[in-house]
C-alpha cells in the first residue's frame, strides 16, 4: 500500500496542488498553459500504484480542463512513450530526448482546447510548427462540441 501512497502523493496530489494554485492566476491574466506528463504503462502489476496515480492525474486533468475549455488557459496531458530512463529501462525503444517535441507541443497549441491526450512519439522528428499543426488537427479535446 505504501507504493500507492507515495505514487499518489507525487503523481496526483502534487500536480493537483500546483494546478489549483496557478490556474486562478492564469484565468485572471487570461492566459496559461499546463502540460502534465502521464504514462501508458498497463498490465504491469508491479507498477500498479504508479499506473493508478497517473490514471487519476489524467482524470483530474480532463476535469479541470473542462472548466477552462474555450479560454486561453489550456491544460493538456502528454505521454512521452517508452523511453530509456530508470523507469523505462535500457531496452526501451526511445531516447528520452525523442519525446521533447511531443511534450512541449502542449504548451504551444493555440486553439483553446483543453484535455488533450498527446502521445509524444507521434511528434518525433517534427518541427515545433508541424507538431502544433498536427496536435490541433489530430488530437481533439474530449469535451462535447458546442454547436
Model-predicted segments: where are they?
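Substrate-binding pocket helix/loop in short-chain dehydrogenase/reductase
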Residues: 3-5
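Catalytic tyrosine of NAD(P)H-dependent dehydrogenase/reductases that use a Tyr as the general acid/base
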Residues: 7, 16, 50
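Active-site helix of classical SDR
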Residues: 19, 53
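Active-site-adjacent segment of SDR/Rossmann-fold oxidoreductases
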Residues: 26, 44-45, 63-73
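Residue(s) in the substrate-gating loop at a strand-loop-helix junction
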Residues: 39
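Active-site loop immediately N-terminal to the catalytic Tyr-X3-Lys motif
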Residues: 44-49, 91
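C-terminal helical subdomain
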Residues: 73, 77-78, 85-147
Amino acid at each position: 500500500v505504501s507504493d500507492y501512497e507515495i505514487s499518489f502523493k507525487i503523481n496526483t496530489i502534487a500536480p493537483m496542488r500546483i494546478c489549483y494554485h496557478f490556474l486562478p492566476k492564469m484565468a485572471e491574466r487570461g492566459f496559461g498553459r499546463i502540460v502534465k506528463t502521464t504514462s501508458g504503462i498497463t498490465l504491469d502489476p508491479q507498477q500498479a500504484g504508479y499506473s493508478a496515480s497517473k490514471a487519476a492525474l489524467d482524470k483530474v486533468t480532463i476535469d479541470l480542463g473542462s472548466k477552462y475549455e474555450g479560454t486561453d488557459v489550456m491544460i493538456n496531458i502528454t505521454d512521452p512513450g517508452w523511453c530509456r530512463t530508470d523507469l523505462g529501462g535500457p531496452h526501451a525503444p526511445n531516447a528520452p530526448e525523442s519525446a521533447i517535441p511531443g511534450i512541449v507541443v502542449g504548451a504551444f497549441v493555440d486553439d483553446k482546447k483543453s484535455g488533450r491526450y498527446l502521445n509524444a512519439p507521434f511528434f518525433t522528428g517534427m518541427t515545433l510548427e508541424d507538431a502544433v499543426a498536427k496536435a490541433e488537427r489530430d488530437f481533439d479535446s474530449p469535451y462535447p462540441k458546442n454547436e
